Amino acid sequence: MLGFAKKLFGSSNERKVKTLATRVAKINAYEAEYAALSDEALKGKTAEFKARLEKGETLDDILNEAFAVVREASKRVLGMRHFDVQMVGGMVLHFSGISEMRTGEGKTLVATLPTYLNALEGKGVHVITVNDYLARRDADWMGQVYNFLGLSYGVIVNGLSQGERQRAYRSDITYGTNNEFGFDYLRDNLVYSVDEMVQRGHNFAIVDEVDSILIDEARTPLIISGPTEDRSSFYKTIDVLVKELILDKSMFDHDEKQKQVILTEDGQEKIEEILMSGGHLAEDSAGLYDAANVSVVHHVNQALRANILYTRDKDYIVKGGEVVLIDEFTGRMMTGRRLSEGLHQAIEAKEGADIQPENQTLASVTIQNYFRLYKKLSGMTGTASTEAQEFDDIYKMSVSEIPTNRTIQRIDDDDEVYRTEREKNEAILKQIADCHVRGQPILVGTVSIEKSEELSKLLSTFSFEKDGKKVKGIPHQVLNARFHEQEAVIVADAGVPGAVTIATNMAGRGTDIQLGGSIDMRLFNWRQQQRGMGLEITVEDEAEERARLETEIADKKAQALAAGGLFVLGTERHESRRIDNQLRGRTGRQGDPGRSKFFLSCEDDLLRIFAGERLDAIMRTFGVQEGEAITHKWLNNAIATAQKRVEQRNYEIRKNLLKYDDVVNDQRKAVFEQRQEFMESSDLSDIIHEMRRDVIDDLVLRHLPPKAYAEQWDVEGLTERVKSILGLDLPIAEWAAEEGIADEEMKERITKAADEYAAQREVIITPEQMRSVEKSFLLQMIDLQWREHLMHLDHLRNVIGLRGYGQRDPLNEYKTEAFSLFEKLLGDLRTNTTRWLMTVEIAYAEPEVPHTPLDNLVEVHLDPLTGENAAFAGGIPEGLSTAQREALPVSALPEGWDRTNRNAPCPCGSGKKFKQCHGSLVR
């Protein structure tokens, strides 16, 4: 019935796109009129639109004209005209949706439409990309259109000063990575002056590669942290003990499907015995699970996880003595990102690497809750429909599949499933050799560094026939986390006839494989070659070389097309269908032909864990011989079903984590908003006075209960607390002995004495100085209390799941206890602020507020595209002073770079001129 209705009325996506398509005709109606305008008249439209908005019109009212203006400006400035389907994509973004557009359909150009329209309000538009390079490239490229139309743009990248960030955020349009925007938000809530804040609100955001950022990054919070006590020696000790323990597999249970490992009863007894004999358990403790040994149990569990669940060259690599995580979705190194709760230190101990100290969280926010700060949020990607439910549930964004400008010519073959990995690899090698001989470029996708290097070794020794001769070794390139520095060169040649490229998951890479090769990269290499020979490059020389290369690349493209276009070969299915679709999407761009096929085996992780035994039994039943594969539509459906189950499980995990984080998020917003009010206020004396009154009320209520007799009062306790918190030595015992004295009168006397003492202390310095001291104390105290609160919440989150065994809902328990902890935070804030201001000796000096309020801050910062810490480029830290740069030798640059023309693009691929990038390092 549902299928019939869909045929009759069309899917909801088709209806939505059809509705928006009718509006495109109205936009197109302005094209001839605007084409006839002079440049000045076209630029004047921006001021006209702003004036109309001020008079009460809405963005929706001027959408048709604004989109038409951007299209015309783009034609004049970039020589690029928005297709009608791109107009539809732009409208989806404006209406807070997700535009699913295929590879090569021009998402970057589409973003200019809603960006310009929403920037007219003057509240700022943020365009989020996955790395600094793309942020710079897109800003400089599309910024030409914005500048032409009278709007300003800025770029937020790693290494900018506070002033540069402020200027970028005050632009009409700001480009940057999700990490930079998120960390700026956190840093803004750690500074002590409004003048130090850089962001100006969260109005409208367009997220490129939205599935990568809002789904893949959803379980990883952005964290700013500071160092704590060094326990590296204990990690090493526990690792040695656990390594010895797990030699006997009966000591632990390992659940691959749930990714869990726990000690068996025998294992618990054995490790307890070892720890006890080594003197690692607390004295007089009842055993390993005594409350006094909680920390030891935690170390044992993390060492167990490190040794059993985490595999070298799959989950992480060791590079330069450092353990670097690998993103399971992109295959990228995640330099700068560390596992929490001591797990990263446990892996470092396992590998004998330098153990970095643990860090205490100072401020954190999940990607989900950061982006939910925006009043309006939209996104673009090539693959979002498989996660449509999650986008709708969590972000309230619907996914719209935008039709391609040209019909997709790609053929997706059924999967081939073999019994063993060896048989599968043999079939893969034959397929690669066939493509190579026929001149068809092939991209081979693997799920890990380990797999890509294994396949590379097999290709190097594989023998095949070419031109009637026996040849050993298929020439190929490997692109994985180890060699990502060579990515631009490798991807540029991946579309050349006969090219073989092995790559770990290509998700989120922003790469566009062009059949025949990339003319830009070929030109760049030619320039480098000419300069290396000391030759001067003229405009005529470059134009001549470009024409020659265009002809050569056109010929090579024709050869690749004749061979069938780019062949994408998947060596395993990923847990997520979206990652598989991203790999497939690398071929068949802009109407080019292409082919994709997955080669699987019953020993692959996905099939082995979820369907391995059943599938192997079926193959035996049907008498599948060695080297034979089974291929069938029902098999594809069965694999897709397994993937859906995993996706649903992962979604439930993310959704569950979000429920817990929402509890923290409500508290975070309350604290950050209160902190903001404190910073913006020039006089907090009323708040300080109110806090002091509340503290006195609490003290009297606790020690002099309202319905108790005077004889039952804790007079001694109240006297001590008043002295320690208020700095007052009052005759409270004498007051309590008075006939008919009541708790209210006691409260009034203490309050009066406290007010008088506070007034006396104000005389020590001027009122203005006192206000400054109060503000400084209050901000420092709220930061201190918030850090401790986050630590308590982390501990609570780690143990709250055990409440489920007592038939209690862990989430409700967490909400209740988190609220109690928050109330304690507020009480401690009042008490400690009052104690500081009433007891600390005041000696005022003009404060020198540093840009960063805390030393030794660590940003857990991932660049999803390059995988490297963006603070470093080519091994040279960005943001060096002139003196520091002058102290660097020319040899600090990679070999040959010092001969680069100063006005040429920098070889590092940043998009900047050489003199503005690595050239600035040369004296």
From Swiss-Prot:
This is Protein translocase subunit SecA. It comes from the Bacteria. PROSITE patterns: SECA, SECA_MOTOR_DEAD. Part of the Sec protein translocase complex. Interacts with the SecYEG preprotein conducting channel. Has a central role in coupling the hydrolysis of ATP to the transfer of proteins into and across the cell membrane, serving both as a receptor for the preprotein-SecB complex and as an ATP-driven molecular motor driving the stepwise translocation of polypeptide chains across the membrane. It comes from Caulobacter vibrioides (strain NA1000 / CB15N) (Caulobacter crescentus). InterPro entries: Helicase_ATP-bd, Helicase_C-like, P-loop_NTPase, SEC_C_motif, SecA, SecA_CS, SecA_DEAD, SecA_motor_DEAD. GO terms for molecular function: ATP binding; metal ion binding; protein-exporting ATPase activity. SMART domains: SecA_DEAD (SM00957), SecA_PP_bind (SM00958). Belongs to the SecA family. One of its GO terms (biological process) is protein transport by the Sec complex. Pfam families: P-loop_SecA (PF21090), SEC-C (PF02810), SecA_DEAD (PF07517), SecA_PP_bind (PF01043), SecA_SW (PF07516).
